[in-house]
Amino acid sequence: EVLRTPYGEPSGAITFGQICGRPVAFLARHGYGHTIPPHEVNYRANIWALWKRGAVGIISVASVGSIRADLRPGDVVIPHQIIDYTWGRKSTYHEGQQCSVTHIDFTEPYDRKLRVQLLTAASSAGIAVSNSAVYAATQGPRLETAAEINRFERDGADVVGMTGMPEAALARELAGVTRAHERADGRRG
């Protein structure tokens, strides 16, 4: 299903199915046939379309390069943090004169509950996973220079990829739409 959004068209149609009896939706961020480079993906439309179709969690699958010596090609990594080195990408739903200034809590960019579920499922399936990694999100589509990789390592990054941002921030913004942030004034105590 192709869903129109206020932010333009998503990268492609959303495919619906089931895994182990649970409903899932799949959206190819680079388009079918891998035709959209990372800096041209309409991340806002993609995340909005998934949200409008009722997604309650997003598992983002991406190809990354390993910076950390103990991470080998083929290893499964579930990052816990992200550093954004991208620029010029539409990275918020809260912009324009009709929107108020909104700040999302991005201290933990990835949903803790969903990470635990993924780690538990991987363990149950006997899949070894690195559960502590910092993802460096770069602009693409070119690969990074050796000097850039050295910088990312000094900054604390463990893996490098091109699609982690603004995807994670946009998903967090929409997750906050239906979630209470704190007790209301007059209700604390």
Give the predicted meaning of each segment.
Residues R142-R183, R187:
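A C-terminal functional module that forms or caps the active site or interfaces directly
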Residues G33-T35, I67, A136-L143, R187:
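Short, small-residue-enriched loops and turns at beta-alpha junctions
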Residues R22-F26, V56-I59, G74-V77, A128, ...:
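Structural motif
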Residues S66-R68, D84-T86, E167-L170, G186-R188:
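Short gly/pro/ser/thr-enriched loop/turn and capping motifs at secondary-structure boundaries
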Residues Q97-V134:
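Metal-dependent peptidase/peptidase-like ectodomains
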Residues E1-F106:
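Metabolite-binding pocket within alpha/beta catalytic cores that recognizes anionic/polar moieties
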Residues H39-N42, N46, I59, S63, ...:
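General structural feature for long, well-ordered alpha-helical segments within catalytic domains
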Residues T120-D158:
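Active-site/ligand-binding-proximal alpha/beta "capping" segment
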